């Protein structure tokens, strides 16, 4: 069978990134000098998650176009200034300071990789610049720097802890799960997920028999998997980016060890199925924020952005980027200003209802809750026949609100 994706990831990244930069340049040229400046700081070319960053930018720019067509925000246009952080924390920190101090942006979107957000979240908090996360899902990203401190980190996207609560509820409910093994990558994303896995497993009283780690660029995880196998793990919880999850599946195939695989939403990334292959890709189950059973309005937006994103699976990040931009614009209008403090306060008490593409938002944030999407907004997902599909079985059907502990 030919590969699912013909161009290489690098070729896709180079072509897509050039298009994003060109689009950003066109937006700059279309608006006046007093445009409201927004920034994007995230990986667009380097890591397995870069396609998610590119898709988010497409969604953000689509929202900017629609706001312009509707008359602008406070009578002004918006400019998106894009910075590729190459998945490198030092570069991401540099980008953040540049966007705020030199470009004068009033808000920042991103990053793609959770570890980078954790590396620089003190910067926007110190400088009072709201951040609208729409890709990175580490639980700690939206936590305040200290108890009761003003918090400028918001998110419209998935949250690791929410996913972990759900997949471990599935494991606890599944009669075939008796012994669980954890397998996580050593990045900030992987280890943030591990922290959630360990905490929620303890709360739910689950039997964890192995806890192994691997590097994000590893291609052979048979040593770690043999330790899970020797411990009798019948279920593996894998927390990693798309490509390494695919390598885990290939490593399982090498030793003919196929436990139940519950994993992070990074398995929806095209890099996962390209690494695993179509057959092995069908084994894990995971959660996403956008169902493959799209409603007519979502389908219309999908048709609009699909030519600009790498794959169908990246659509959810365009949705997150679009909805996050619209919520930010609502806050700016409500505040009648672009001042960071006033915009943060408006976000925490948004008036009115916004019908987004992920959900209908009604007072989505508060002073202490900065997540736009919650447990009720998650969708069980798998791969079938080389395409994402809704997943359901007797365990999913039997899950009840009281099962989601943590």
Where are the language model's segments positioned?
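Extracytosolic ligand-binding ectodomains
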Residues: 2-15, 31-406
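C-terminal segment of classical bacterial N-terminal signal peptides
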Residues: 22-29
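Hydrophobic helical h-region of N-terminal Sec-dependent signal peptides
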Residues: 17-21
């Amino acid at each position: 069978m030919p590969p699912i994706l013909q161009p290489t990831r690098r070729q896709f990244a180079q072509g897509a990134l050039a298009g994003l930069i060109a689009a950003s340049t066109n937006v700059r040229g279309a608006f006046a000098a007093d445009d409201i400046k927004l920034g994007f700081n995230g990986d667009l070319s380097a890591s397995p998650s870069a396609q998610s960053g590119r898709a988010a930018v497409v969604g953000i720019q689509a929202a900017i176009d629609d706001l312009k067509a509707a008359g602008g925000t406070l009578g002004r246009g918006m400019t998106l200034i894009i910075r590729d952080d190459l998945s490198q924390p030092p570069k991401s920190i540099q980008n953040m300071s540049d966007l705020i101090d030199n470009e004068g942006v009033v808000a920042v979107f991103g990053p793609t990789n959770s570890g980078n957000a954790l590396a620089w979240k003190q910067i926007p908090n110190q400088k009072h610049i709201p951040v609208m996360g729409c890709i990175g899902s580490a639980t700690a990203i939206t936590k305040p720097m200290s108890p009761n401190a003003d918090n400028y980190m918001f998110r419209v996207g998935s949250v690791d802890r929410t996913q972990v609560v759900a997949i471990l509820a599935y494991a606890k409910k599944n009669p075939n799960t008796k012994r669980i093994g954890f397998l996580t990558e050593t990045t900030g994303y992987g280890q943030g997920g591990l922290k959630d896995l360990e905490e929620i497993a303890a709360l739910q009283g689950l039997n964890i028999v192995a806890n192994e780690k691997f590097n994000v660029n590893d291609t052979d995880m048979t040593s770690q998997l043999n330790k899970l196998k020797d411990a009798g793990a019948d279920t593996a919880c894998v927390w990693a980016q798309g490509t390494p999850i695919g390598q885990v599946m290939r490593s399982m195939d090498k030793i003919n060890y196929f436990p139940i695989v519950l994993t992070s939403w990074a398995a929806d990334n095209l890099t996962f199925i390209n690494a695993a292959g179509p057959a092995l890709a069908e084994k894990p189950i995971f959660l996403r924020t956008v169902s493959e059973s799209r409603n007519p309005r979502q389908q219309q937006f999908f048709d609009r952005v699909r030519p600009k994103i790498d794959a169908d699976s990246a659509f959810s990040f365009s949705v997150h980027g679009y909805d996050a931009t619209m919520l930010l614009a609502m806050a700016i209008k409500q505040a009648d200003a672009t001042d960071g403090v006033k915009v943060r306060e408006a976000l925490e008490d948004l008036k009115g209802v916004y019908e987004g593409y992920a959900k209908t938002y009604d007072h989505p944030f508060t002073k202490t809750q900065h997540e736009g999407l919650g447990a009720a907004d998650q969708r069980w997902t798998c791969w079938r026949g080389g395409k994402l599909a809704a997943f359901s079985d007797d365990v999913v059907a039997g899950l009840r609100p009281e099962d989601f502990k943590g």
